[in-house]
Amino acid sequence: MISSSPATGILDRLGKASSAEEFFSLLGVEYDPKIVNVARLHILKRMGQYLAQEKFAGAAEPEIRTRCKAMLERAYGDFVASSPIDERVFKVLKDAVSDSKKAAAFVPLSELK
């Protein structure tokens, strides 16, 4: 577990976290282990997408922590209400949808040897 040194900011501590559970612990977010076990990477990826939209420059540490907590709660909520397949945060899942929209290749029986 990462120490809670006041000199280390929450973003640094999150960057060093080694598990999804550690993110939840650092930010004090309650979670259902069954949901995290199924969607841990998806939740963290979605949180990363939310973090990428944020501007933290000049923000005080308590505000940064509060905003990070809200983003993790929002990302977690996305997967409480939906599934990783429905949310499609990873490229491989997005591509699976676009590939299925392509016309299926047709091979007539007469072409088979």
Swiss-Prot record:
Function of the protein: May protect the nitrogenase Fe-Mo protein from oxidative damage.
One annotated GO biological process: nitrogen fixation
Self-association and partners: Homotrimer; associates with NifD.
Alphabetical keyword list: Nitrogen fixation
Family: Belongs to the NifW family.
Protein name per Swiss-Prot or TrEMBL: Nitrogenase-stabilizing/protective protein NifW
Upper taxonomic lineage: Bacteria, Pseudomonadati, Pseudomonadota, Alphaproteobacteria, Hyphomicrobiales
Signal peptide limits: none
